[in-house]
């Protein structure tokens, strides 16, 4: 919670997206409500299976839209143990870099530098497959799974996601929310040195046109879809605010959704048997 607060309008300006973890074990004394599927070992309660992770997330309010929640941990070939958030952030930064710094793509289904899932030294869990990983995803938990002949980050959602219960499409995918933050941060970075200059009509139009140009460029590279619109409306800029030197531009746009799943509907037909009868092509 402290990280989320710290990452909200840093220095009064900048938006940041938090990647955090659910624990694989916690001191039993810190648990107020029973965690479904958990087991006690000594003075600790193990959060070492899918059901326990989902229950712990719900009980402890890991549902903020500005964060991505990861579970479990991972271990590499040399025995080093990493938090899921570390592995996810590594993939996220690499993915951003491949897109020229634009957070248009989720780190989900990107390579993870581990050789196994890790649930803590006291756990007997040997791991889970993609089916159970999808159960975690449905609860807004990002995980690590063996898929496509390699270990990969799995889950494109924010912590606010819960299958069938999301009313705000903006918070479904991590890249959607991060794109909104990116656009807001870019606006502030672009015009920071203009603050306290005379706000002429020409400058107002320059800002609007430049932001529209940037929005159209994001469409061109696939970061946004449709036709984003930048506005400067009288209804959003009252005389009282203008007198104070406060000006508001509006942006409306649609981040490109990830290809979360694809289905090919395969049907059988006996129409092909017709080729055995009638004139064959080229027959004389």
Give the residues covered by each predicted segment.
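A glycine- and small-residue-enriched flexible loop/hinge signal that marks low-structured segments
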Residues: 1-190, 232-233
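Residue-level marker of positions within ordered structural domains that often coincide
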Residues: 22, 216, 256
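C-terminal edge-of-domain segments
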Residues: 236-284
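Acidic, low-complexity glycine/serine/threonine-rich segments
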Residues: 172-235
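A generic structural signal for short, non-catalytic loop/turn and secondary-structure boundary residues
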Residues: 12, 146, 223, 242-244
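Glycine-rich loops and low-complexity Gly/Arg-rich segments
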Residues: 41-45, 178, 211, 274-279
